Amino acid sequence: MLPVKLTEANYPAVIELWEASVRASHDFLKPEEIGFYKPLVLKYGLPQSDLYGIYSNSVLAGYIGIRGQKIEMLFIHPDFFGQGIGSQLLQFAVKQQNCTLVDVNEENPRAHEFYLKHGFKLYSRDEKDDSGQPHPILHLTLL
């Protein structure tokens, strides 16, 4: 399965996947916080990133958002967790798009470990996320 370029026409499927993934993997977020972030992802996150997705039997299984050399987002639908789709998308971003940077929620150790396993290292930490919420962000780089 190769990543394909996603467009604005794919946003409904992308945001549905985003929400399912966040609900399954971001247990530190309250439901109202997910409601706070969702319109921000739609308004700023998706349009400001180059999006690529992997489909399985015509279903969007995962996607990655890239801006410059930074991975802005990588989300996998819970039905496809543990099947290597995240690794495929990450390798595509690193090898084909020359990505070397990513931010990850400190409260999401599974994601942090995923990036460490793929060679990323911590270079800085912020106490709050980009929207000022008290969710620490780890800034990682590929060495």
Task: Map each language-model feature to its residues.
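A short beta-loop-alpha structural element at the N-terminal edge
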Residues: M1-E16
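Conserved beta-hairpin
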Residues: S49-G62
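Conserved GNAT-fold acetyl-CoA-binding loop/helix
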Residues: E16-L42
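Conserved GNAT-family N-acetyltransferase fold
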Residues: Y52, I64, Q69, L74, ...
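Conserved GNAT acetyl-CoA-binding A-motif
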Residues: K95-E107
